[in-house]
Amino acid sequence: MGGGHSALSGRSLDTFEKIRLRPNGKKKYQIKHLIWAGKEMERFGLHEKLLETKEGCQKIIEVLTPLEPTGSEGLKALFNLCCVIWCIHAEQKVKDTEEAVVTVKQHYHLVDKNEKAAKKKNETTAPPGGESRNYPVVNQNNAWVHQPLSPRTLNAWVKCVEEKRWGAEVVPMFQALSEGCLSYDVNQMLNVIGDHQGALQILKEVINEEAAEWDRTHRPPAGPLPAGQLRDPTGSDIAGTTSSIQEQIEWTFNANPRIDVGAQYRKWVILGLQKVVQMYNPQKVLDIRQGPKEPFQDYVDRFYKALRAEQAPQDVKNWMTQTLLIQNANPDCKLILKGLGMNPTLEEMLIACQGVGGPQHKAKLMVEMMSNGQNMVQVGPQKKGPRGPLKCFNCGKFGHMQRECKAPRQIKCFKCGKIGHMAKDCKNGQANFLGYGHWGGAKPRNFVQYRGDTVGLEPTAPPMETAYDPAKKLLQQYAEKGQRLREEREQTRKQKEKEVEDVSLSSLFGGDQ
């Protein structure tokens, strides 16, 4: 290729350098991309001169088209570059690589060829009977043929058991994977579980109990069977321990009457799985409570997960949903749910409690509290009525404040309340709550008739002579007791004086001394 980029020259090269690598991208094709394409052609056994013509690019595209879907990044880049060069040779105006690839595929109908090839491949891989290979038993040439379970199905079952750890999801997963299976296939699904042998032992005990109950209710007919007649299945036959695959197929599809041993065995296994799930998930629905900061949606998920593992009739589960779901919610959600009325739907509850406990709900409550407080502050002063006129504390006049008063500043004592001196220079004691009255320093009395200005004031109603006055009686008792004490003190004093007189010297000489 001479200079390494002789595939394009002149105007073709200018057009090539204007095409973008990606839609709406900044990078564009350069000469180095042509040099790289020439080197890559040798790896696929193609000559580099094929890039110089439209027909040569067409041959390269035909070679690379089958390899492009599963090829490497280098092969895909070479295919895209050949499409761009073909568009330049064919004078097809394109803006980027993606548009060039679409133009080439539409011109050579490569899209239709790919669809036909994929359709042909699917037809060759489909089973002859027209049934899906995922179904264990298929009808081929008017004969029922058993197909073993695919490793993908078994792997999905084992992965579910290992991840969910016998959660409530295991039972519906088993129902989906074992649809249409025979007893042989169900046993195969149970045998691939390596761990959890304790759970499998519980499952076996449930299967044995159900098989014994089947044998008790389905007694085999007495006497030998007619020639060519198929025997009735026993409990062990349904469990797949004493029956072959062909016998299970005959009982399921050709017997008269038909007995779907696979479906019956699935019921037994589902009962055992439900018991295992209940034992491995001891948490009851009654114990599910919403946390103080837990979203209501997460609480509902935990509640229904525990309810799914609960072995109870449907009416009991409905009662649990209607009562316990609201009863065990936190106070915030419970207050909202009770406002929805009787028997609200789950959708209404989820919408009503959306965001409760989160930052948005807390911010909303904070805004409501602040608005209520602001309203209380605004409404509070209005109840006291309008404020009165301003009063000066210096001169006592209305209309101005003390700092605006033009009168001389008066000094007032805070102890006695008089004007002219300060509290530190006050000679009087501190005034009590009654202040200083006309009684001076004496204790004020509560009786009006003892006041100086009301000495001659008499009560208008006459006193009741027969009325009992406890205060007067008590005062009389105090007066009598005081009189007795004074008399005792006087008598004691006189006795002491007499004793002193007896021991004096005047008694020795008589009255003449």
UniProtKB/Swiss-Prot annotation:
Name of the molecule in the record: Gag polyprotein
Note, other: This is an African green monkey isolate.
Domain of life: Viruses
Entry GO CC: host cell cytoplasm; host cell nucleus; host cell plasma membrane; membrane; viral nucleocapsid
Sequence motif PTAP/PSAP motif, residues: 459-462
PTM annotation, UniProt: Capsid protein p24 is phosphorylated. Specific enzymatic cleavages by the viral protease yield mature proteins. The polyprotein is cleaved during and after budding, this process is termed maturation.
GO biological process: viral budding via host ESCRT complex; viral translational frameshifting
Pfam families (alphabetical): Gag_p17, Gag_p24, Gag_p24_C, zf-CCHC
Known function: Matrix protein p17 targets Gag and Gag-Pol polyproteins to the plasma membrane via a multipartite membrane binding signal, that includes its myristoylated N-terminus. Also mediates nuclear localization of the preintegration complex. Implicated in the release from host cell mediated by Vpu. Capsid protein p24 forms the conical core of the virus that encapsulates the genomic RNA-nucleocapsid complex.
Basic and acidic residues compositional bias, start-end: 481-501
Lipidation (N-myristoyl glycine): 2
UniProt family annotation: Belongs to the primate lentivirus group gag polyprotein family.
Ranges annotated as CCHC-type zinc finger: 390-407, 411-428
